[in-house]
């Protein structure tokens, strides 16, 4: 049966979405709406006109919590009256539940943010992040709920004493969820340490559009340089210092390497300093944030993709590189070994091992034939296991199974 037929009449709430959404969430929303699923996006942002005319998609504006205390209380009062008109019993219940729930935010803020959902109904409520499910825990009693476990909120944040509320909130949300989506087997095993019942979990791996991300139709630049690329937020868990150390080793070995970094983040200054301190200014190009078209252009001009992460679920950036026909050197963080088979689509090396990264890149530089072989294998792997259309179908089946 076609996916669109299977999904007929299904109404799904995406709760706690920032705007604009992450690229992978935007792709999922569009994939679902194209299959006949009605998606309501709950966001404090203001989607632009292009999103507001997408068939089968509507927006539920949720209140922010900025401004003076008086203005926040005034907004909360107005929302309370509107919610009580829709359903007074549900409004009272929401107030009681937020007082019983532990969080890093005040009960008043959480109550205010719950009010837009009072008196409204969906077949399934979807939480793209663990923290969102914890924040909106009372919503999980309104409809069957699904939570996504993606990476850092499972394998990093629970170790932070300042985020004990997240660690302690995982088990209650797992118990209430009708199903839990994990981006990899590795993330599923990590989540099991915090109370996930594996029997209610489903692994649906990240995906990309191989029609968009594809090898260049013409030859790659051939000026003698070995072009290595990486994309991702400039944050500590991406391990950029280890990548730069590997590049430094290649330079010392006489490899004419050019390392391109695409992305921005909280540690931009640290990245700039490290490039300067390692005297890599002539070998590293930091593009900052680029448009999707700009990212594609740089991927198609590269010779290899490097992922130096300390923590991952499965990197969408790596899948985009593979779809463009690039061999990959990746750490074994999280579920990366589920996406890249060592010696087939690239090389899998230990985390924090700049020497192993350098050795793998050196092998790819010395052997253009191996680059082509691994790049072709990577694209075939994406076509077989990581197609965006297959991922959307899998989510439709998951939502339908709990509705």
Placement of each model-derived feature along the sequence:
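A conserved mid-protein helix/loop that constitutes part of the nucleotide-sugar donor-binding site
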Residues: 23-27, 226, 230-249, 266-272, ...
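Conserved acidic donor-binding segment of nucleotide-sugar-dependent glycosyltransferases
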Residues: 342-343, 347-354, 363-368
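Aromatic "clamp/platform" in nucleotide-sugar-dependent glycosyltransferases that forms part
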Residues: 310
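Short hydrophobic beta-strand element within catalytic cores of glycosyltransferases
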Residues: 327-330, 340
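Active-site donor-binding acidic/aromatic loop of nucleotide-activated sugar
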Residues: 267, 281-291, 298
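Carbohydrate-associated surface elements
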Residues: 186, 207
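Acidic anion/phosphate-binding donor-loop and adjacent secondary structure
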Residues: 157-160, 192, 198, 208-224
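Membrane-proximal helix-turn-helix segments that form the acceptor-binding/catalytic region
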Residues: 112-119, 160-180
């Amino acid at each position: 049966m076609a996916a669109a037929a299977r999904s007929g009449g299904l109404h799904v709430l995406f709760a706690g979405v920032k705007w604009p959404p992450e690229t992978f969430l935007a792709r999922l929303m569009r994939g679902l709406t194209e299959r006949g699923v009605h998606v309501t996006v709950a966001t404090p942002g203001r989607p632009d006109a292009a999103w507001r005319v997408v068939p089968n998609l509507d927006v539920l504006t949720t209140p922010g919590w900025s401004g003076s205390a008086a203005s926040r209380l005034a907004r909360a009062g107005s929302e309370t009256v509107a919610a009580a008109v829709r359903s007074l019993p549900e409004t009272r219940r929401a107030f009681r539940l937020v007082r019983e729930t532990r969080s890093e935010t005040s009960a008043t803020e959480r109550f205010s943010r719950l009010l837009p959902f009072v008196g409204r109904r969906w077949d399934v409520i979807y939480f793209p992040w663990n923290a969102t499910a914890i924040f909106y825990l009372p919503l999980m009693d309104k409809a069957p709920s699904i939570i996504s476990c993606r990476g850092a909120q499972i394998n990093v944040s629970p170790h932070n004493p300042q985020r004990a509320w997240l660690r302690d909130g995982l088990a209650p949300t797992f118990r209430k969820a009708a199903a839990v989506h994990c981006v990899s087997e590795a993330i599923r095993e990590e989540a099991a340490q915090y109370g996930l019942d594996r029997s209610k979990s489903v692994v649906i791996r990240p995906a990309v559009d191989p029609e968009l991300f594809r090898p260049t139709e013409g030859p790659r630049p051939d000026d003698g340089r070995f072009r290595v690329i990486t994309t991702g937020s400039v944050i500590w868990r991406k391990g950029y210092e280890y990548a730069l150390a590997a590049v430094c080793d290649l330079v010392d070995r006489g490899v004419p390497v050019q390392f391109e970094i695409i992305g921005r983040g909280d540690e931009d200054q640290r990245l700039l300093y490290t490039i300067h301190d390692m005297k890599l200014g002539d070998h590293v190009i930091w593009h900052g944030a680029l448009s999707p078209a700009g990212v594609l252009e740089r991927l198609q001009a590269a010779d290899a993709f490097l992922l130096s992460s300390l923590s991952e679920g499965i990197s969408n950036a790596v899948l985009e590189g593979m779809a463009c026909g690039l061999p990959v050197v990746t750490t074994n963080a999280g579920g990366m070994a589920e996406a890249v088979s060592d010696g087939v689509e690239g090389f899998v090396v230990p985390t924090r091992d700049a020497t192993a990264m350098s050795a793998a890149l050196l092998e790819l530089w010395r052997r253009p034939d191996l680059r082509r072989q691994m790049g072709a294998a990577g694209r075939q792997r994406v076509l077989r296991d990581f197609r965006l259309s297959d991922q959307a179908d899998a989510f439709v089946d998951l939502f339908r199974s709990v509705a």
